[in-house]
């Protein structure tokens, strides 16, 4: 999906509770991959008002002469996504969706590198194949990447085979550029269904949602984004931001303000292991 198309679709969505799956949680994921029960409900995030028409974008087959890919380890089928991380101390996790984007992602990576911080990037397959060097940079700098589908569709409006194609093609593209298959998956718009959980588990991916939505996808202004992060900061919080899908210049400027503030406040910004 092109940038203007994704932005138009986002504007069709309401900021509300992620009622299609992110309202509860499968547990909190520890930096080492453990779990604990009873996490809090998710903060408001981008939510679908109605199912848009299926994308006309056709998934591009990935071809090559390399060895066959190893079958992923099957996981437990969740019924709700993870919303937070667990562990002792003031730990938080930063996540960025919809990229990589050559205009905004490099600036975000530069800021993270400046403060020696690692983050999670949930990538769209069509962006991965167009920006392989950015995905390689994420791997080199220790960031963890996840699967965010190929064209960013509303999964609840797709047939099961269409969901599988979106997810499988994206995992293949990520492996080609990142060097490893993703072990985390995030549904576009936070709209989960049973098929997404089942297919993700079959592909060796755990579902990850978020605790605090920066609302940067609405371009609310830098000060609003900064306030959302700083007021929502708490141990275990997973922050949702975007590095693509529209004008993300506010996101780029905002992270330069709130990231040093979080670090000065004693927070440790962590990521799950690259291999669970």
What are these regions (language model features)?
Residues 3-5, 142, 180, 236:
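A general, composition-driven signal for non-globular sequence regions
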Residues 57-158, 162, 166, 171-173:
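Active-site beta->alpha N-cap acidic-glycine motif
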Residues 1-94, 101-114, 257-260, 264-276:
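N-terminal pre-catalytic segment of deacetylase/amide-hydrolase enzymes
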Residues 52, 77, 117, 143-145, ...:
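Alpha-helical structural elements
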Residues 107, 129, 153-268, 272-276:
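Catalytic domains of cell-wall/extracellular-matrix polysaccharide-remodeling enzymes
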Residues 12-13, 149, 181-183:
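An N-terminal domain-start capping segment
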